[in-house]
Amino acid sequence: MVKIVDNSEVYNLIKNVTDRLGIEIIEINTFRKRGEGRVQIVLYKGDDFGVDTLCDLHKMILLNLEAVLKYNFSLEISTPGINRKIKSDREFKIFEGKKIKLMLDNDFEEGFILKAGADSFIFKTDNKEVKVLYSDVKKAKLS
């Protein structure tokens, strides 16, 4: 019987590798169709890391996953990208200090995430600083 792995299992398998290198796991997606699989992982480190680091991470993570996954799969590793949609409260903390586009009503406003807390974050624009509840955010993306 072929073991099907879920996102939390992949997270647990790679967490020690990413922790040692000071890298945050932003997102994991696993897909399985007709005996083939795909694992997509988005990683982030405050000071950007290059292609060489991504290649090394790919090798290390692939070895960890191959030990558990007993079916053919491809592994895709990437960084968040410059226009990444912020998908969780946790990501506001990860991206503290970064410039974002934020939609609370119907228009985007550009500013920075100054500080992220448990239920809100401080958003700074050119002329104001406001406390924003995560529940009030319609959309947010890196800018």
From Swiss-Prot:
<dbReference type="GO" id="GO:0000028">
    <property type="term" value="P:ribosomal small subunit assembly"/>
</dbReference>
<dbReference type="GO" id="GO:0006412">
    <property type="term" value="P:translation"/>
</dbReference>
<keyword id="KW-0963">Cytoplasm</keyword>
<protein>
    <recommendedName>
        <fullName>Ribosome maturation factor RimP</fullName>
    </recommendedName>
</protein>
<comment type="function">
    <text>Required for maturation of 30S ribosomal subunits.</text>
</comment>
<dbReference type="Pfam" id="PF02576">
    <property type="entry name" value="RimP_N"/>
</dbReference>
<dbReference type="InterPro" id="IPR035956">
    <property type="entry name" value="RimP_N_sf"/>
</dbReference>
<dbReference type="InterPro" id="IPR028989">
    <property type="entry name" value="RimP_N"/>
</dbReference>
<dbReference type="GO" id="GO:0005829">
    <property type="term" value="C:cytosol"/>
</dbReference>
<dbReference type="InterPro" id="IPR003728">
    <property type="entry name" value="Ribosome_maturation_RimP"/>
</dbReference>
<comment type="similarity">
    <text>Belongs to the RimP family.</text>
</comment>
<keyword id="KW-0690">Ribosome biogenesis</keyword>
